[in-house]
Amino acid sequence: PDLEKGWKVVEASGCDNAKIILDTWHWVRANQPFEKVIDMIPADKIVSVQINDVQARPYAKEVLRDESMHDRVAPGCGYGDTAGFCKMLQQKGVKPNAVGVEVICDEYVEKGVDFAAKYTYDNAVKVLKEAWPEVLA
């Protein structure tokens, strides 16, 4: 699935409270362009954003879920242009109710939960300060 299909489900629901959650990992792995797809969705229909980053090469399609569950990297530390994703949403006027970090990375956890939490937090703040400082206020 991609954002266009997800948006069609939200639209077809006819519910005012049906909204979209965007995630940078899914965005990159679905090969979504920055400039085109987001235009069809009103800014107020994007309720939440999850940021993270991706490895340089995706896992094979048959095991892509394994990448999602073990190798998402901290925002700005991979190859997915997390800052560009955030800038796209900021320029569209998106004001999400929540911006979260969804980093699931065995390498970070092996260094300890304290390391994983601090490293992920520090890199998320760095990306957001650069690309979308309003969400930090």
Named regions from a protein language model:
Residues 3-22, 27-137:
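Histidine-acidic metal/acid-base catalytic patches
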